[in-house]
Curated annotation (Swiss-Prot):
SUPFAM superfamilies: C-terminal domain of alpha and beta subunits of F1 ATP synthase, N-terminal domain of alpha and beta subunits of F1 ATP synthase, P-loop containing nucleoside triphosphate hydrolases. This is ATP synthase subunit alpha 2. GO terms for molecular function: ADP binding; ATP binding; proton-transporting ATP synthase activity, rotational mechanism. Produces ATP from ADP in the presence of a proton gradient across the membrane. The alpha chain is a regulatory subunit. It is found in: Cell membrane. It comes from Mycoplasmopsis pulmonis (strain UAB CTIP). F-type ATPases have 2 components, CF(1) - the catalytic core - and CF(0) - the membrane proton channel. CF(1) has five subunits: alpha(3), beta(3), gamma(1), delta(1), epsilon(1). CF(0) has three main subunits: a(1), b(2) and c(9-12). The alpha and beta chains form an alternating ring which encloses part of the gamma chain. CF(1) is attached to CF(0) by a central stalk formed by the gamma and epsilon chains, while a peripheral stalk is formed by the delta and b chains.
């Protein structure tokens, strides 16, 4: 009887139990007062609980409540890009003076709790989503439509990896949704500032739920995923980042305790896995040719990957990038533990050239780790071990990549070849050499031609001519020592066969150091 009276039975913090001769439905919204709403999150034959959005001091036991038509259907307005919004689409902050939202919106409108598409609506992942980070794009390749967990202790660079990936999409058509779940205001400001400074605000929606609003924290990942589905179904690829699901899980635990739901390990409810699987399984690559790539972020304590939440999300996703505080303490950033990280799509999203060289880099890394204990000894090692140690040390230097300094696919491929060839004489000035090559290959006329050839030849089925590439890189590196040793700017540009613009850029960067 939908016309029956519904009243509040009890109030526990932000959870309200209601009763009445009414056919309660999960996810239904109720009006408690003029500015307080409730969301039906648990219903059975005996009890019904609402999650409250608003000040519970304004309501009391016995108050009659009214069911609403709303069931959290997300409508994605195109003016959301470049702004921070909440689950209702209200603008919380915008760099632009115009904070009004026009009526121009994506056609599709999905429910926040839409059931994930079946296998018949999905296709195999075969396109890369490049992060610009050497260690990930070479050793842990990610595909469009992949669900890739970012897991690690606080302050180990998880958010930085996500932001770097976002920045690397600047030149393509991928839309981005960054979901802030209970982040501190200072962290949120820093993220938004980075998005604006890196000129990706025009393609990014930043959604935020404050740490003191459990209602918004509970709902925001589901609402954000509905926005991602709206965009994807309109013919655009989407990257969605949940930062972080640890805060979301903590809200689920609080709700379970307040509603008397049975809890288990770490006091989490038994349906914790289901709560996150029904969210993350909505990502993927679909038959319309477009995708939703998902990066859930989870915090660990003391690098412990065996916690319930971490193991749950790892079993749902298609791989994990593990950051480690001990690696960070060694000064290596991003602090990715390659031994514990994995991408289950692997070479299926890499070109033949990248896949081939990635295998060689992986071998060098693993063999170096096996022989690392001999690296600082005076033992008489055989040539193969010495070669592995030399290449391994150089590889570790290259893995230490500056924040937001994205490497293109062709540059990553060239760096990987350099490591395998062993043409860096030693591990000194590795960063300077990379900067030199970066500017030459990006800005110099001859360098651009070389990169274009590498891009073309390293397509899905193409192969790079290693002999030609090696000869050209050796020629460029032969000039590095002379350029690095120049003490003044009164040098003969023509001596190095490089454009004046590039030579100035390279030399200025080296002088800065």
């Amino acid at each position: 009887m939908d016309n029956a009276k519904i009243v509040i039975k009890s109030i526990k913090d932000y959870i309200v139990e209601v009763q009445g001769d009414y056919d309660f439905r999960l996810y239904e919204v109720f009006q408690l007062t003029d500015d307080v709403k409730g969301f039906c999150l648990s219903v059975d034959e005996k009890r019904t609980f609402l999650l409250i959005d608003g000040d519970t001091s304004k309501i009391k036991v016995g108050t009659e409540i009214i069911p609403l038509e709303s069931r959290f259907i997300a409508k994605t307005y195109k003016d959301y890009f470049g702004k921070i919004i909440d689950i209702d689409g209200k603008v919380l902050y915008s760099e632009s003076e115009d904070q009004e939202i026009s009526e121009k919106a994506y056609e599709n409108e999905n429910s926040a709790f839409k059931v994930a598409s079946g296998i018949q609506d999905r296709v195999k992942l075969n396109e890369p989503l490049e992060t610009g980070i050497f260690s990930i794009d070479i050793l842990l390749p990610i595909g469009k439509g992949q669900r890739q967990l970012i897991l690690g202790d606080s302050k180990t660079g998880k958010t930085s990896i996500a932001l770097s990936t976002m920045i690397n999409q600047k030149e393509n058509d991928i839309k981005i949704i960054y979901v802030s779940i209970g982040l501190k205001s200072n962290d949120l400001k820093r993220i938004y500032k980075t998005i604006v400074e890196q000129k990706i605000a025009h393609k990014t929606i930043l959604m935020h739920a404050s740490s003191d609003n459990s209602f918004q924290q509970f709902l925001i990942p589901y609402v954000a995923m509905a926005h991602a589905e709206n965009i994807m179904q309109s013919g655009e690829d989407v990257l969605i980042i949940f930062d972080d699901l640890t805060n979301h899980a903590n809200v689920l635990r609080e709700i379970a305790l307040l509603t008397g739901k049975p809890v288990g390990k770490e006091a989490f409810p038994g349906d914790l896995f289901y709560s996150h699987s029904k969210l993350l399984e909505r990502a993927g690559k679909f038959k319309n040719g477009y995708s939703i790539t998902c990066f859930p972020i989870v915090r660990t304590i003391n690098n412990d990957m065996t916690s319930l939440l971490a193991s749950n999300i790892a079993s749902i996703t298609d791989g994990q990038i593990v950051t480690n505080s001990e690696i960070k303490d060694q000064g290596i950033l991003p602090a990715i533990d390659i031994g514990l990280s994995v991408s289950r799509t692997g070479s299926s999203v890499q070109s033949v050239s990248l896949s081939k060289i990635a295998i060689e880099i992986s071998k060098i890394y693993s063999k170096y780790k096996q022989n690392e204990k001999f690296s600082d000894t005076n033992f008489d090692l055989n040539d193969s071990v010495r070669d592995i140690i030399k290449k391994g040390k150089i590889l570790l230097k290259i893995l230490n990549q500056k924040e937001f300094q994205a490497y293109s696919r062709s540059f990553n491929l060239i760096i990987a070849y350099i490591v395998v060839w062993g043409i860096f004489e030693d591990e000194e000035k590795i960063y300077d050499k990379l900067i030199y090559l970066y500017f030459v290959l990006r800005y110099d006329y001859i360098g651009k031609i070389l990169v274009n050839v590498v891009d073309k030849k390293s397509g899905v089925d193409g192969m790079v001519d290693e002999g030609v590439l090696k000869a050209e890189i050796m020629r460029l590196l032969a000039h590095f020592k002379d350029i690095h040793n120049i003490k003044t700017k009164s040098y003969n540009d023509g001596k190095f066969n490089l454009s004046t613009r590039v030579l100035h850029k390279v030399k200025d960067r080296i002088w800065e150091k």
